[in-house]
Regions:
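Short, ordered, surface-exposed loop/turn motifs in non-cytosolic proteins
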Residues: 14-34, 38-41, 331, 429, ...
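Short, acidic Ser/Thr/Gly-rich low-complexity loop/linker segments typical of extracellular
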Residues: 32-59, 345-347
Length: 566
């Protein structure tokens, strides 16, 4: 029998917090226990082999059975609700990486609940008809092609009451590709399909296809309207590697700016005017390149374009890979990010090289980071590694900032008595918005509201999403029951989520203020707070002057270095 592989990664808060000691049980299709594992300090289990069937079955469009063997996983941890994932497809020669996102138990919760997710066969093996509609241009469109990070996915048909989840764009594409096609397909077939998936999603965002109709999401997971997405499913190594390389590349027609509407179907039981998923396998086996495959199904003048506008990223990729011997501000940025990330992931070694100089310790930290997050462990900071480091840095620093805010607000243990609804304003609304911001880090279906003290439509949507998540009537009104649930959830997070390593005593960074700087931007970049900068420098206001020298608290290893914004 053929062999495939399974690796489980238990994390929470957008990967900012690895969960060690999670008990993982792997069962075969009939429920027999095969492995009992425990996650390490990175939240990861060893990769285990599992029997499956030969990959030739998943490369044959006429095979009517399951081209894989299914397994089930149960994840349990003290202080967290449990997760059971069934019908996980394991393919010949492929490693399935299963993300286990556990939800902290509420403060008053006596026993864990169990969430169940079923995976099953990919959409290409389904006979469901597709009715994908879209345009290359719309009266209401964005001016630039932007990678939405995160992208908001509605887990149902457009008009259904299903929940929305937010995921990073690369993770979304990996999920869709793993849900749509077989990971055992030839390389160029995989690439052509992934280009179509990326471009389809970017077309929905660019034309504001759903948001212009009043919906609060970017795309659905309904294959009748959009493309498959199974929240909580495993991602396959062959797909993950390609997406990391091309997630910001898309298909457009020559002379046009907008992402082409790349409709597709399986091409066997369902036919369409767009790309045939099974047809890409035949064309790839004939030696066609990904672009040639795309031009076979779409207009002959389509081309591959790239956008570097990615929302939610602290620093954009400099355009040139960083490696041993590289120097400069970009190297310094990565060193700062890695030294902060290692507080949450202590297996990453400390960067002790001089600031801005890519030497042995930087190489070791980069390589370990790549190993932990399923990137090619070559020690080179290319596009995929840069954006993953940047994304994780944003996640860990956001948690630290929220913790600092909670101390400043003095949340306490007794909820406010005021009943809040859309139109309310004031300190209680700020408290509400803060609680929702914290909860949104651990509950993927709860969107993050702006913290402005005004109960607007965004806060109302967040409240209703939270109410659905905790089985309250989603009326958008914050009365006693909702306040209690908010506090129970918030206190449960504080009690059950492991804290990162304490910040080491570091030196300071001398920072020369330049045009466009603000205390908030500087604090975000160096993982500190505005208050900490003001205290260290004896500032009584937020006003900065160009050329002013500030001392910035540093968690890095170098005691002092001078940094000037370019």
């Amino acid at each position: 029998m053929a062999i495939g592989y399974l690796n489980i990664q238990a994390r929470t808060a957008h990967d900012a917090v690895p969960l060690s000691g999670v008990q993982i049980r792997i069962f075969d299709f009939w429920g027999n226990s095969l492995y009992v594992l425990s996650t390490d300090e990175n939240g990861e289990t060893p990769t285990v082999p599992l029997e499956t069937i030969d990959k030739s079955y998943s490369q044959n469009p006429y095979f009517s059975g399951n081209a894989f063997v299914s397994y089930h996983v149960l994840a349990q941890a003290s202080g967290f609700n449990s997760l059971y994932v069934s019908d996980i497809p394991i393919y010949d020669g492929e490693t399935a990486f299963l993300p286990v996102t556990l939800i902290p138990m509420q403060e008053t919760q006596r026993s864990p609940l169990q969430t169940e997710i079923s995976i099953g066969k990919p959409a290409v093996a389904s006979h469901e008809m597709r009715h994908q509609e879209g345009e290359e241009t719309e009266p209401r469109i964005l001016r630039q092609v932007v990678i939405p990070n995160p992208i908001t996915v509605h887990l149902g048909t457009p008009g259904s009451s299903a929940r929305d989840v937010q995921v990073t764009f690369p993770d979304y594409v990996k999920n869709v590709a793993s849900s749509e096609i077989y990971p055992t397909w030839p390389e160029n077939a995989l690439r052509a399909n992934i280009y179509a998936i990326i471009t389809f999603a970017l077309n929905r965002v660019f034309t504001e296809w759903y948001r212009s109709k009043g919906y609060g999401f970017d795309i659905t997971n309904s294959t009748a309207y959009d493309q498959a997405f199974v929240y909580g499913r495993p991602i396959y190594g062959s797909i993950s590697r390609i997406v990391d390389e091309i997630f910001n590349e898309y298909v457009r027609r020559q002379g046009q700016h907008s992402p082409y509407f790349t409709s597709f179907c399986n091409g066997t039981s369902v036919t369409c005017n767009g790309l045939s998923q099974w047809g890409t396998v035949t064309l790839s086996n004939q030696g066609l390149s990904p672009l040639e495959i795309l031009r076979y199904y779409y207009p002959k003048d389509v081309e591959i374009a790239q956008t570097d506008i990615i929302t939610g990223v602290v620093s954009s990729y400099p355009g040139t890979p960083l490696r041993m011997g590289s120097t400069g501000l970009d190297v310094q940025t990565i060193q700062t990010y890695l030294n902060r990330i290692r507080r949450n992931y202590p297996a990453i070694p400390a960067v002790t090289d001089p600031a801005g100089s890519f030497q042995n310790s930087t190489n070791a930290a980069v390589t370990k980071f790549q190993n932990i997050f399923n990137l090619t462990p070559d020690g080179i900071v290319g596009k995929s590694t840069w954006y993953k480091i940047s994304s994780l840095y944003a996640a860990v620093t956001r948690l630290a900032e929220l913790d600092s805010e909670g101390t400043s607000l003095g949340i306490g243990t007794v909820p406010p008595s005021a009943v809040l609804r859309q139109g309310s304003r004031g300190q209680d609304v700020i408290t509400l918005q803060y609680l929702l911001n914290v909860i949104s880090e651990y509950y993927p279906s709860v969107p993050r509201p702006a913290q402005d003290g005004i109960f607007g439509s965004g806060t109302a949507q967040s409240v209703m999403a939270f109410q659905r998540a905790v089985n309250l009537s989603p009326d958008g009104i914050v009365g006693p029951r909702t306040w209690k649930a908010l506090y129970d959830t918030y206190q449960g997070i504080g009690q059950n989520v492991p804290l990162p390593s304490p910040e080491p005593d570091g030196g300071t960074i001398r920072y020369v203020v330049r045009s466009g700087d603000s205390l908030w931007l500087i604090a975000q970049k160096y993982n500190t707070t505005v208050d900490a900068i003001k205290r260290l420098n004896g500032l009584t206001s937020d006003i900065l002057n160009i050329g002013q020298v500030l001392n910035i608290p540093s968690s890095g290893s170098a005691p002092y270095f001078e940094y000037t914004v370019r």
